[in-house]
Amino acid sequence: YAQSSSKHLAEAGLEFELRQIPREELEAAIKDANQDSNVSGILVYYPVYGDKRDQDLQDMVDPTKDVEGLNVVYNGKLYGNDRFLDEDKTRKAILPCTPLAVVKVLDHIGVYDHDLPYGDHLRGKTIAVVNRSEVVGRPLAALLANDGAKVYSIDINDIQIFERDQAASINSHVISKTDFKVEDVIPLCDVVITGVPSAGYKMPTKLLKPGVVAVNFASVRNFEPEVKEVASIYVPSVGKVTVSMLQRNLLRLFNYQH
């Protein structure tokens, strides 16, 4: 991802500097980058610790330079389904690059229905997200649910449902725990999105609904080769779109700074 980011940012005329920092020096490095007027955006490659300390690092990044949108400020906006940073709605909140890339891919291939009202473009869609990391899977499930989908969020421990609370005064999602198994929910899904960072993991093709949209955002292929025989659309990677979203976030932050 770092190499791809560097290449594509350079092609767009944007400077990318990879700083390899020992873990024990990372906090100081983030603070230095926050104060450096020559730095327009900061991207930390996670996981660093693989626990809640990573969230502490995310919250250390200055929101005006947080190109991944993982700071508590942007998290609050995402999970509260509030797209703007200001009351006048002139500055949009930054969204995490990979979840945003998946959303853009789904929109491009026609999963989003723009004949429905704004905020309901995924109404009637059932989607599985096989990954619940704080960096990708959880925010992706929230984004999809906030757009009206019923989302089965699947990780190694359990399956949770993310969906809009139609009775609530705000238009954000609620989360319900379930006792479902993967084989219970995957056949119900119009879209199956995988992001398991293991070459040994494969989504069983036999579980997939005929005509399903299958999207993989992991660095390895999570679907079996036979997926092409079942899926109406199969997207094996969103890496290039993710880098495009990184560029988009960076340019948006640069405009906010100036």
Each PLM stretch: what is its role?
Residues 15-96, 224-227:
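Phosphate/diphosphate ligand-binding glycine-rich loop within oxidoreductases
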Residues 1-7, 84-203, 213, 228-229:
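Glycine-rich phosphate/diphosphate-binding loop of Rossmann-like nucleotide-binding domains
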Residues 41-44, 194, 215-216, 236:
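Redox-cofactor binding/interface segments in oxidoreductases and associated redox assembly factors
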Residues 27-31, 181-183, 205:
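Short hydrophobic/charged patches on amphipathic alpha-helices used for structural packing
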Residues 36, 185-187, 207-208:
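A short, aliphatic-rich alpha-helical micro-motif
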Residues 47, 195-198, 218-219:
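Short glycine-/small-residue-rich Rossmann-like dinucleotide-binding loops
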Residues 12:
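Long, contiguous binding/interaction regions
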Residues 55-71, 75-85, 200, 210-258:
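Rossmann-fold NAD(P)-binding glycine/threonine-rich loop
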